[in-house]
Structures are given as structure tokens and as C-alpha cells.
């Protein structure tokens, strides 16, 4: 009897371990633009998902893409209505929103999720095709206009901040900028550049993702940051530049 109980317990343990092993969460696959395009071309039925804002989508997007704004109130309900048996290819501007969206898709049961590394910014930089019905490459500030603004502040450090209304880390940094300006005793001038409304400047300054920050002194770019930068780190960098 004891032997039977032992065997039964062993079988139960093996089944439990097997069940745990097969219960691992699904993960999305990250692909570079070239591989992303190649796989899209060879895939049969699939969903191509652009998770940027409608405004961003209207300017430039991949052919055949469906737009569901990751930050939209209806994001979860809309992706919940998609066919979970089809592979999903997802992208955004530079990869932040698409990575989060890919995680959400796998969490709700999509088993084949592919996310584009570097987003549409990298896609365009590598000369892959886009649809651009409403895109005006010349709108917004020119490089010459920006340079004039920088040169006009010769006695200060100039911080050029590329941001967007939908960018969470951009908002976080914008909130502490007034305090940073005060800490720098009037020696810091901040120029905000909206990423979506200044495409020619984005291209000229080679901004691939946001937030993007540049520090200028005497009209010369001294330091560049990609991504969120803590207030204290910026203060240290600015103080270093201000030292005689």
C-alpha cells in the first residue's frame, strides 16, 4: 500500500511540475525593420498594428496598418476584438509604446506578437516605404531658426528639448524644468520642440526617439541625451558647463 501511495504521489508531482513548465507567459519577438518588413511580406493573414496617436498615423504610417492608440481610452477594448489566431506586427514611433502594447497583447492571449525595434523612426531612417498622405516635411521650425534662438542666448546654457504631448517621460521632465531653471540662477534657457510638429528640425538634428535633449554653450552642442534624464543629472551637467 505504501508503495502505491509513493508512486501515486510521484506521478502527481511530475504532472504538477509539467503543468508549471507549460504555464510560462508568452513573449513577443523583437525584430529590426529589415526583418520586420521581410516577415510581413511572407506572412499570410496577419494584423499590422500602429499604436501611435491618430495625428502621428495620419502623417506617415506603414501600408495596411491599423491604428489603435496605445494611450487611447479604448485601447484594451479594441485590441480585445482582434482575431487572436492571427500574428500581430506592432510598431510605434521609436519602440516604447509598441513594447508595452506587445506585452498587453501577449497578456490577453495573442501567441504570435512581433514588435519592431526602433519604430517607424528607424524604419524611415533605413529607407523603408511609408504612406504619407498628410505629411509636410517643411512644417515647423527650421534649423536656421533654431540656431538663431540658440545664438541669441550667448550668456546662458541652452537646453533644446524634443518632446511630444503623448510622451510620458517628456511630461515628467517638463514638470521639473521650472525648478531647474531657478536652480541655475537664470543661466539656463530651455527651448521646447514638439516632435510631431517639427519634422524638418527632427530630421536635421537627427532625433531618432524622444525625449531627446541637447545642451548648447556659445552656440555649440556640448552634450546630448536620449531618453529620460533625472533633474539632478541635468543640473550637474549644466553646472559643469558653467564652471569658469
Name the predicted role of every residue range.
Residues 171-183:
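Typically the conserved alpha-helix immediately C-terminal to a functionally engaged Cys/Sec
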Amino acid at each position: 500500500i505504501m508503495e502505491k501511495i509513493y508512486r501515486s504521489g510521484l506521478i502527481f508531482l511530475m504532472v504538477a511540475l509539467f503543468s508549471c513548465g507549460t504555464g510560462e507567459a508568452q513573449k513577443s519577438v523583437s525584430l529590426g525593420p529589415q526583418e520586420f518588413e521581410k516577415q510581413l511580406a511572407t506572412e499570410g493573414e496577419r494584423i499590422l498594428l500602429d499604436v501611435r496617436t491618430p495625428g502621428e498615423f495620419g502623417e506617415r504610417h506603414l501600408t495596411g496598418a491599423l491604428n489603435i492608440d496605445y494611450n487611447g481610452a479604448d485601447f484594451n477594448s479594441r485590441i480585445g476584438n482582434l482575431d487572436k489566431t492571427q500574428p500581430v506586427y506592432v510598431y510605434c514611433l521609436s519602440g516604447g509604446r509598441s513594447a508595452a502594447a506587445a506585452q498587453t497583447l501577449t497578456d490577453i492571449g495573442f501567441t504570435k506578437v512581433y514588435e519592431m525595434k526602433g519604430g517607424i523612426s528607424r524604419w524611415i531612417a533605413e529607407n523603408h516605404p511609408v504612406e504619407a498622405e498628410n505629411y509636410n516635411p517643411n512644417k515647423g521650425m527650421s534649423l536656421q531658426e533654431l540656431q538663431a534662438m540658440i545664438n541669441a542666448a550667448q550668456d546662458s546654457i541652452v537646453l533644446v528639448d524634443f518632446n511630444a504631448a503623448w510622451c510620458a517621460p517628456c511630461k515628467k521632465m517638463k514638470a521639473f524644468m521650472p525648478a531647474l531653471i531657478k536652480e541655475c540662477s537664470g543661466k539656463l534657457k530651455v527651448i521646447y520642440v514638439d516632435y510631431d510638429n517639427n519634422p524638418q528640425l527632427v530630421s536635421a538634428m537627427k532625433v531618432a526617439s524622444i525625449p531627446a535633449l541637447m545642451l548648447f554653450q556659445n552656440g555649440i552642442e556640448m552634450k546630448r541625451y536620449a531618453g529620460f534624464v533625472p533633474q539632478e543629472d541635468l543640473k550637474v551637467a549644466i553646472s559643469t558647463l558653467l564652471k569658469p
